[in-house]
Amino acid sequence: MDAEIISVGTEIVLGQIINTNAAYLANRLTQLDLPATYQTTVDDQSQRLERVINHALTRAQLVFVCGGLGPTADDITMPTVAKTLGKELQTDEEHWKWIQKTFEQRQIKMEPENIRQAQYPRGGEPLANPVGLALGCWYETKGKVVVVLPGPPAEFKAMVEKSLVPKLQQYFQTRKQITSRTLNFLGRPESQLMDEIEGATNDIPGISITSYVQPTAIQVRLTVRDLPVIEAEEKIDQAQKAILAVEEPFFFGVGDDLTLAKVVVEQLKKRGWKLTAAESLTGGMFQSAICSVPGASTVFNGGFVTYAASAKEKLLGIPHATIDRYGVVSSETAATMAEGCQRKLNVEVGIGFTGVAGPDMLEGQPAGTVWIGLAMKGRSTKTVQLHLASYVGRQAIRTLSVQYGLQLIYHELKK
């Protein structure tokens, strides 16, 4: 079984956006034992897309066409797919009524072109879009399948999980059984982690172990093929037990979509504690990470973005003498930021971020110099200094600072 992923979009071809959809779909297909054999990217030009689809159908049995399902002139995917298949477009009347009702409820003027989001090639099967307007499509032709999916990542992932994966599992029900589990680790170099995991699982046959590096974390996927689910889960349990006997201090949970922010929120919930933050170089990114977790309101009431020294003094009560003596980028300032926000909101945990995001130096310190302060109920205030590589850029320095802050809280809450 050969599968091909076709990504449609001039922005992707020109490198203006990163193609996360193709990576996501390829990963899910691998988990379903339907690995992609080819990936192609093409711009928003109908004739070129038609040639790409025709070529894909000569070498693949399963073809995915991703992106270009909007109502604008450059959204050419569904009409082009229909033309390539020699079919007319048909309208899903129920979905079209739902689109009209949605625009009416939101009090937004609807253009006639929006009907394109309710259309698909005649003879195909519409795929529901749980979080957007445009339908996808599943079309079977001469022993092959063409699948059309939307471009916006949130819509893409929702349609893949809710509409496409169940359809693939039903259609390819004779495929081999595949069972997998993802373990998440932090604070460990990938090469060292994988060497130790290999040593711990040498005597467990029939299990595949692969790693995927994320910012400041590593995902390790355990996979078993060709066994009934119960037997496969038992083998994975055995492997996980052997791995955690060696790597437990660096393990923070199970799941493909698990984030450290979610784990921290759950830890705080269990204690009945609340968290706040005072951010300088991260500019609210830490608080955004916390608020992205459903249910975060039970542990987070609010926080501070104190970019300027004057804001640190006014909002957090940091003595001017502290900043004047030690500087903004210092252990002392990070500590007083953490203590100040904790005190102001009367919560159990306060964290402070100060540093140099770059590209320029600040107070004689290079980009990538970061101090994080942590004030926690019943414990002495702790500070940690980071020396992040300046070449990764301003945004990466800010993102990594947030992740290291989450790590600091996580480890302290585990004690």
Swiss-Prot record:
| InterPro entries noted in UniProt | CinA, CinA-like_C, CinA_C, CinA_KH, Competence-induced_CinA, MoaB/Mog-like_dom_sf, MoaB/Mog_dom
**Which Pfam families does the entry mention?**
CinA, CinA_KH, MoCF_biosynth
Q: Which domain of life is it from?
A: Bacteria
What Gene3D superfamilies has UniProt attached to this entry?
CinA-like, MoaB/Mog-like domain
Q: HAMAP family under this entry?
A: CinA_B
Q: Which family does it belong to?
A: Belongs to the CinA family.
Its name, as the record gives it, is: Putative competence-damage inducible protein
